């Protein structure tokens, strides 16, 4: 991570590659103009990639074990170009109910009107996924773990079943996985049979909550379709954002390991608090998904869910949130700062919903001193009960 994506042709002597603000690129000869690499490894036109995006893609590919990667303008654009690359009118896509809600709504509200059949499935469907696959299925979309509820797919099982059923039907099904929570530091999906990994690099890659960025990591078979989808839709990542993403990667391991440690301590403390019904965090030994997490991941993200002991009214929640000293309220996560927000299940969620009837919170552990974070939570939960 420290030295990937630092080719001399990009750096020109600088330690970090300066942002290249350019749309038009000048060729030195007709031969150079005619002969540039058609897999877009060269700097030929701003929308096709800059030295900053090329370096970021190179570094991420090395870290994730990908053949090539594609940098995009956000995590949602990464999902868009991937889905659009493999789905056409009349095709069927299976989407986990545990997906990031804007991703699920992208499938239902954007792709479905174009004639794509969208079907959701429980994140713990297991062998039951075989019955959902049909000749028109072209994509299976996973997220590990689930957003909000943090179930863990049995990825090995799902991949095996999809491949077997696809072979029986004589079809080609692309398996896509959103790997934002663990990142390539703690999980490498392509090594587990996944075809395409999508990453909201806005989160841990950038790491400082100051840039929007997405990355799609591809196998050799999936790369050209994904890259073409980005080109046809005019989706690319800016040089400044790629600069910040590449800079963030240099310290990502140190940040994520410390945040993981903080999250584990916070999860353990919350699990013993009387105001908390359940902590949704697979790395914790008390999680019902701990064994699957241990089988799949080498570490964990610092995002978790919290189910409180009852449904709290708005004024009580205001007592909790409005006076937190370290935990801030804000969308997104993955930066150095700790965040705490009230949340709810996805609009399309239908499985196990009764388990989440009480007030549901989402917590992101940052880099602050963990004792200070726990003290902030202790005071906040006391205010919640007193309100």
Language-model segment annotations:
Residues 278-361, 365:
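Conserved C-terminal alpha-helix-loop-beta "cap" of PLP-dependent enzymes
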Residues 26-30, 223-224, 311-315, 347-348, ...:
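Short, acidic Gly/Pro/Ser/Thr-rich loop/turn segments
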Residues 24-77, 103-109:
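Conserved N-terminal alpha-helix of the aminotransferase class I/II PLP-enzyme fold
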Residues 234-235, 322-332, 380-387:
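A common structural junction motif
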Residues 3-10, 68-275, 280, 291:
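Conserved PLP-enzyme active-site core in the AAT-like
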Residues 1-37, 386-387:
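N-terminal glycine-rich, Lys/His-bearing helix-loop that initiates the first secondary-structure elements
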Residues 6-8, 21-27, 181-183, 203, ...:
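Glycine-rich beta-alpha junction loops
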Residues 108-109, 117-119, 138, 160, ...:
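PLP-dependent enzyme catalytic core of the Aspartate aminotransferase-like
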């Amino acid at each position: 991570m420290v030295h990937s994506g630092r080719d001399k042709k990009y750096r020109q002597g600088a330690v970090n590659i300066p942002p290249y603000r350019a749309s038009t690129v000048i060729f030195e000869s007709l031969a150079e103009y005619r002969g540039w690499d058609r897999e877009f490894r060269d700097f030929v036109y701003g929308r096709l990639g800059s030295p900053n995006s090329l370096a970021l893609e190179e570094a991420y590919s090395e870290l994730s074990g990908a053949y090539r990667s594609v940098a995009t303008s956000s995590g949602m654009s990464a999902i868009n170009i991937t889905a659009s690359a493999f789905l056409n009118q009349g095709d069927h896509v299976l989407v986990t109910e545990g997906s990031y809600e804007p991703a699920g709504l992208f499938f239902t509200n954007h792709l479905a009107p174009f004639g794509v059949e969208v079907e959701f499935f429980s994140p713990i469907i297991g062998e039951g996924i075989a019955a959902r696959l049909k000749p028109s299925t072209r994509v299976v979309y996973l997220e590990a773990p689930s957003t909000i509820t943090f179930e863990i797919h049995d990825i090995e099982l799902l991949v095996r079943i999809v491949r077997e059923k696809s072979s029986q039907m004589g079809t080609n099904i692309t398996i896509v996985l959103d790997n934002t929570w663990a990142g390539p530091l703690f999980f490498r999906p392509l090594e587990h049979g996944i075809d395409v990994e999508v990453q909201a690099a806005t989160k841990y890659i950038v790491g400082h909550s100051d840039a929007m960025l997405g990355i799609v990591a591809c196998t050799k078979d999936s790369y050209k379709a994904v890259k073409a989808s980005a080109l046809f839709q005019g989706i690319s990542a800016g040089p400044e954002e790629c600069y910040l993403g590449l800079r963030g990667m240099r310290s990502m391991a140190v940040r994520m390991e410390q945040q993981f440690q903080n999250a584990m301590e916070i999860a353990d403390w919350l699990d013993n608090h009387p105001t908390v019904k359940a902590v949704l965090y697979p790395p914790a030994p008390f999680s019902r998904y701990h064994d699957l997490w241990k089988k799949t991941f080498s570490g964990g993200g610092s995002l978790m869910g919290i189910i409180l002991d009852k449904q709290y009214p708005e004024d009580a929640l205001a007592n909790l949130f409005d006076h937190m000293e370290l935990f801030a309220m804000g969308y997104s996560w993955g930066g150095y700062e700790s965040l705490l927000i009230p949340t709810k299940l996805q609009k399309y969620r239908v499985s196990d919903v009764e388990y989440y009837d009480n007030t549901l919170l989402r917590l992101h552990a940052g880099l602050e001193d963990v004792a200070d974070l726990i003290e902030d939570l202790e005071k906040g939960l006391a205010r919640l009960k007193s309100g």
